Amino acid sequence: MEQHDPFGFVGLTYDDVMLLPGHTDVIPSEADTSSLLTRRIRLSSPLISSAMDTVTEARMAIAMARNGGLGVLHRNLSIDDQAAFVDKVKRSESGMITNPVTTTQQATLAEVDALCGQFRISGVPVIEDDGTLVGIVTNRDMRFIEPEDMDSTLVRDVMTVMPLITARVGIDRDGAIALLNKHKIEKLPLVDDEGKLIGLITVKDFEKTDQYPNATKDDEGRLRVGAAIGFFGDAWERAERLRDAGVDVIVVDTANGESAGVIDIVRRLKADSSFDAIDVIGGNVATRAGAQALIDAGVDAVKVGVGPGSICTTRVVAGVGVPQVTAVYEASLAAKPAGIPVIADGGLQYSGDIAKALVAGADTVMLGSLLAGTDESPGDLIFLNGKQFKSYRGMGSLGAMQTRGKKTSYSRDRYFQADVPSDDQLIPEGIEGQVPYRGPVSTVMYQLLGGLRQSMFYTGARTIEELQMKGKFVRITAAGLKESHPHDIQMVVEAPNYRR
């Protein structure tokens, strides 16, 4: 057995290295930032939002997918709520809505108004019990109904009745747009030969397609979304509900992905044919052996990072972890030969760190603190000393792991503390804090991708794959890092992509 040399393994992180410039014939606007998230899913932006309860819920997941990335819904909530978030993302855009929200003639307008508010839609088809389309009710039909009459007025009294302008399933985009334009309507129901409602096309979906040309979508034109699960307790039930809700990616998300429980549930997911359409990401790991264990279990991508996050204390509480550049590189040694993409999760402070992660061997990066301050993250704005902030906490923080509601915390088993009997016996591996307000996600992603394109220009890489091949590191000293940042000056105007 080979003896381990405890001092022969040097760990480097993003501040320890720089990329070497090289000959280039690339300009930033020509750089292609698309990259593989999993074996089967490619993103136009290699950015993923972290599965944290102060980062990713439905609103963030929608924004990430529209801008070419992907959101991973956190699991520190009930199964019903997480599945509802998946459904909300999948319904937010669609080439054709295959299971549209509907109502009946006997429903009240108050019930329809509640449906429209819940799903953020302006109207619903009206069907019989057998699915036959009999009309449609929209905001225009309800506009002049007094609020006090909404509970007593029925849909049949105000709806637009058949015959409606409809189409058959299989109509192409141009044909649908032509019908919508010709008849000046916003919704086009799709029916079969018996007049039963099969789907719905809306003009808003076409507008969103034009507005977000690089959106991450499935084969049906719906936004893609990921969701996190654990391995303990209700993990399998959660996975099944997420599958039924239409999730595209399941992330088995724990602090140590090389554990037996994680490997077992990955194997179960990959062996169950009902999950064949869903890609499985496993994590987190920080070594070649950890990545290999997940690859052997059948993952479609490996997530790397033990303790690099700004709110994580694992490395000081447990004394365990590997600096992130080295961790990503080590994991890639196992993943690349197997054709498995690598996700660098945590520790990224600037856009330049994204390029460093990709050169180290990652295919995409997962962001927490860089997105926690955006409009789309959960939580309210905090005003402090004339500046705006938003809350941000680690999933290993005491607040995230404490019991809630039915004496349940869905974050405990991420840190393998599901068996801890009371809150005062928890061992936190994270902190709670706040980050500066950054505005909308689209603005932050624009700056991050712009920085990545600049990296590709400097290294002469037109694609992420070229960046991974051409990129070369130089190790730097503490003095070199100091020189890399603005120095010997008092900054009076903040740049949108730099804070210190």
Describe the residue ranges of each PLM region.
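Catalytic cores of alpha/beta
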Residues: 59-62, 237-245, 286-304, 344, ...
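Short beta-strand/loop segments at the ligand-binding rim of alpha/beta enzyme cores
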Residues: 42-49, 95-100, 162-164, 218-228, ...
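Glycine-enriched alpha-helix->loop->beta-strand junction motifs that scaffold or abut catalytic
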Residues: 65-70, 244-250, 274-277, 296-301, ...
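Conserved active-site-proximal phosphate/metal-binding subdomains
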Residues: 4-9, 212, 309-344, 348-500
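Short hydrophobic beta-strand motif reused across regulatory alpha/beta modules
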Residues: 134-140, 198-202
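Active-site-adjacent beta->alpha loops and helix N-cap segments on the catalytic face
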Residues: 29, 78-87, 145-147, 152, ...
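Catalytic beta/alpha-barrel core
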Residues: 72-76, 102-103, 123-125, 145, ...
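Bateman/CBS regulatory modules and CBS-like beta-alpha motifs in cytosolic regions of diverse proteins
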Residues: 29-43, 50-52, 81-121, 126-128, ...
